[in-house]
Amino acid sequence: MMQQAIDKVIRRQDLAETEMMAVMQGIMEGKVTDSQIGGFLTALRMKGETVEEITASAKVMRSKALVVEVNQPHSIDTCGTGGDQANTFNISTAVAFVAAAAGVTVVKHGNRSVSSQCGSADVLEKLGVNIDLTPKQVETCVEQVNMGFMFAPKFHQAMKYAAAARRELGVRTIFNILGPLTNPAKVKGQVLGVFDESLTEVMAQVLKELGVERGMVVHGLDGLDEITTTTKTKVSELKNGMISNYVIDPRQFDIPLTDKEDLAGGDAEKNASIILNIVKGETGGKRNMVLINAGAAIYVGNAANSLQEGIDRAAEVIDMGLALDKLNQLIKLSQELKV
């Protein structure tokens, strides 16, 4: 099965959903060798992944994941594919606290660093959040503080079979794309940053196929997998079953352009202190970056009627100290749940 799939993809032929599901099942059940996984992932990346191939893979990964039950109709996740090589601070992690403080249920799904200096799990841990939670404990966090964090390796244990091949390859593969698509809480809304402009519409289509109701798939034209403040951003928005494509400019929202250097992060300690300063009200380029992305999260989470309204609400909750409160609530509760 694996040899045929590799051969087909090398010849730049797309796989049908059933074929892709069979390949992913084999990988997730440890039935495929590392060299086969590496060969397949490389060939697939060179061919370019289709909506069908990505959807099929996400379905298999979701079926193998531990489940988190969230009874909120507008729960969201904020994360990107990573792989933009930009080494910015953890923008989507800061955004999660702001959106939750604005009343959006945020169930964040993340990992330690893969392609950056510091992943969301690294920075949350440095901030004092206990990331080692069971599905039930994450559910408790969501019920009590309106947000929770799922540490990907704990919830996607079958991923361990692909880990060695991915590490040895060291390049972006379909797994970078799959991370944000396999949230164990099956959230209904997503702001999803992608590392490649050509992926915005593809990923919006995949979100629709997976049953997501509201989504903004974004790619900064400076290469960032976020809505950027250094230039314009391409957006594919999923709403009411329809996908619309457009470009936004931060200046439309009275946000001045920022230099990319102003968005630089560092290790977990540095990024934790950046996030802390932002939720404490520090102004400047980093705050503006969080505002525009949190605005999108608040809009997608149905707590604002437009991106502008979302941005205004984001500024309000930071300035009122509510985002800092949300961070402290998650730290306190997650530590109390330690077993």
Swiss-Prot record:
Residues involved in Mg(2+) 2 binding: D225, E226
Signal peptide: none
Residues where anthranilate 1 binds: G80, N111
Gene3D superfamilies noted in UniProt: Nucleoside phosphorylase/phosphoribosyltransferase catalytic domain (3.40.1030.10), Transferase, Pyrimidine Nucleoside Phosphorylase, Chain C (1.20.970.10)
Chain positions recorded as Mg(2+) 1 binding sites: S92, E226
Pathway: Amino-acid biosynthesis; L-tryptophan biosynthesis; L-tryptophan from chorismate: step 2/5
Pfam families: Glycos_trans_3N (PF02885), Glycos_transf_3 (PF00591)
EC code: 2.4.2.18
Entry's cofactor comment: Binds 2 magnesium ions per monomer.
Source species, domain of life: Bacteria
Amino-acid biosynthesis is among the record's keywords: yes
Subunit structure: Homodimer.
Protein name as it appears in the record: Anthranilate phosphoribosyltransferase
Organism listed in the record: Alkaliphilus metalliredigens (strain QYMF)
Source lineage: Bacteria, Bacillati, Bacillota, Clostridia, Peptostreptococcales
